[in-house]
Amino acid sequence: MRHTGAATIFAIATFGASFLAPRALALDDEHYARARGMIQKSVTWLRAQQDAKTGGWAVAPEGPQYPAITGLVVNGLIMDRAIDADDPAVKRGVEFILSFKQADGGIYDRVLPSYNTAICLSAISRINRPEAAAAVEPAIAFLRSLQWSEQALEGTEETGRIDKDHPFYGGVGYGRHGRPDNSNLGVYVQAMHDAGLSCDDPAFQRALVFLQRTQMDDRVNQMPYAKGSRQGGFIYATAENKDTIGQGQSMAGTVEESLSDGTRASRLRAYGSMTYNGFKTMIYANLSRDDLRVKAAYDWIRRNYTVAENPGLGTDGMYYYFLTMTRALDAFGTPTITPLGAGDAPAQSRDWENDLVARLAELQNEDGSFKSVDDRWMENNPVLITAYALLALQTIVE
């Protein structure tokens, strides 16, 4: 996040008691100017990709539709200082999103109700128009019903009503109480944050319970798959499916780890995008900087700092990683990162915003779109990855 002035004083959305702190500029003038130019090119390209008939983006001729993609684009557009809710592209995009409002309050077509609703809620929460505002509270209520808890909605796949001891507690899945994971929980928490919910809201506090069970550190996580682990980062889920509850799941496989008792064993591997998702949620939930969960996650981030790839997954989900990284570090409020090298020795401090702008500049095409480097999780879709990149850049220069 860029601010003018040599030592701007600003309120950081951070841990523990809220406080005011000075923050030096990390994004220098050269990278700021480059980022602004990249944003304008991306906006121009995305405008040209809007479906003339429906007003949506990445519209599937045969369906089902994914209004979340339009939600990402609209969110990226509306963050621009020169674009408001009356902009024709934004207005039509919002109309497309709201055309998928359901009687239950969700915003989705036939699939992925939690994912689509959450991302669309983040977008419409920024739109100062009565029709958008009217859809916010129903969407919040719908999302609440999908979080695994004592008060969850009875689902069609299996009941979502469980107590706090269940490994699914606090999580959110793709369907109506399908197996929860940190990716869906990440967009859920982002939506609740963007909609203005308090950090004390049960949505955040329940999310912390699920997160703790996916953090690979036995000082905070008592699940058997974390025994002896001191990675500090996050995995994907507490189960691969309903038949493996409590066994954990990582999209990054396993890693040989020196355990806390001095032995070595194979453990589920923490990786970049899920660690930044978890870290961001802890920030939004206002955990203290001294909380062991926060310190362990940030140490993982320092040991694995990179803008070359999604650490642990290579190029899989790389643009999604860039966005989660940007949002998490922006919320954390630090302009630099001091990576930890071998033996946890500090390395040279990095201006992460400059690093990420430079990396995205390498990946942007002349027409303003971004190069696909992988096809996993739909990252061969140029609209999707350009929206991810635009949101990251907008967050940096905001």
Regions found by a protein language model. Name each.
Residues 1-4:
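Positively charged n-region of N-terminal signal peptides that target proteins for export
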Residues 7-18:
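Bacterial N-terminal signal peptides
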Residues 20-26:
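Sec/Tat signal peptide C-region and signal peptidase I cleavage site
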Residues 70, 94-100:
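Active-site-surrounding "flap" and adjacent substrate/cofactor-binding loops of secreted or lumenal enzymes
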